[in-house]
């Protein structure tokens, strides 16, 4: 009788082991999926920092067009080209560059006004993912998810400029270059900049990188 009672006991042990193993594998799969999401978020942030730094360098190289046009014809400044209310990233300026409406300053000599438009056009393309395209299809795969870029002046010291005909001196402007994008999961809503507000549904999915840069300009 004892032998009959023990029949099937080993099979039950195997089944229990399989159940435990299945739950363990599911847990590992969940951790791997979460790790991939975290890694993707980190990659997005890294790309956003690079994009903000790129525009900061462009502005410092053409600082006279940072906020206001110098004396002469009307122009598009960096802050006017990428305002908070209509941020860059739609590809409209980059399309102007590709069709020749914006001058290619890498191949031709440009004025400071033309250089500003060239910088704005290229940055618009980078935000829109044109830096890398899939072979054969042309699909944009180089950007971050629904990226938008904004440039705003946060402060300046122009009030310290001496009245003419005092000797020429410099004043400082602080510009904030912001890059926003759409995150995977809900987090607390960002407060560093309003760039991209309302573009991603709930603001808890909006991610933001804000980069402040100081530019010096001659007093008017």
Protein language model regions, located:
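Aliphatic-rich helix starts adjacent to a transmembrane/signal segment
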Residues: 2-53, 62-63
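Flexible, low-complexity segments enriched in proline/glycine/serine and punctuated by aromatic residues
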Residues: 15-16, 43, 49-220
């Amino acid at each position: 009788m004892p032998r009959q009672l023990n029949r099937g006991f080993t099979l039950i042990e195997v089944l229990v082991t399989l159940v435990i193993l299945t739950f363990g594998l599911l847990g590992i799969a969940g951790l791997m999926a979460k790790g991939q999401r975290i890694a993707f978020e980190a990659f997005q942030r890294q790309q956003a920092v690079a994009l903000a730094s790129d525009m900061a360098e462009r502005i410092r190289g053409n600082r006279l067009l940072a906020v206001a046009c110098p004396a002469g014809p009307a122009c598009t400044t960096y802050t006017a080209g990428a305002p908070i209310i209509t941020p860059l990233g739609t590809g409209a300026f980059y399309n102007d560059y590709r069709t020749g409406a914006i001058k290619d300053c890498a191949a031709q000599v440009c004025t400071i006004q033309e250089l500003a438009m060239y910088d704005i056009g290229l940055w618009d393309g980078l935000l829109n993912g044109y830096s890398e395209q899939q072979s054969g299809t042309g699909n944009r795969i180089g950007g971050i998810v629904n990226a938008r870029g904004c440039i705003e002046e946060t402060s300046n010291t122009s009030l310290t400029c001496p009245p003419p005909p005092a000797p020429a001196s410099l004043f400082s402007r602080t510009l904030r270059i912001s890059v926003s994008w759409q995150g995977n999961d809900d987090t607390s809503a960002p407060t560093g900049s309003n760039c991209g507000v309302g573009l991603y549904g709930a603001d808890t999915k909006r991610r933001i990188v804000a980069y402040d840069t100081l530019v010096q300009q001659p007093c008017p």
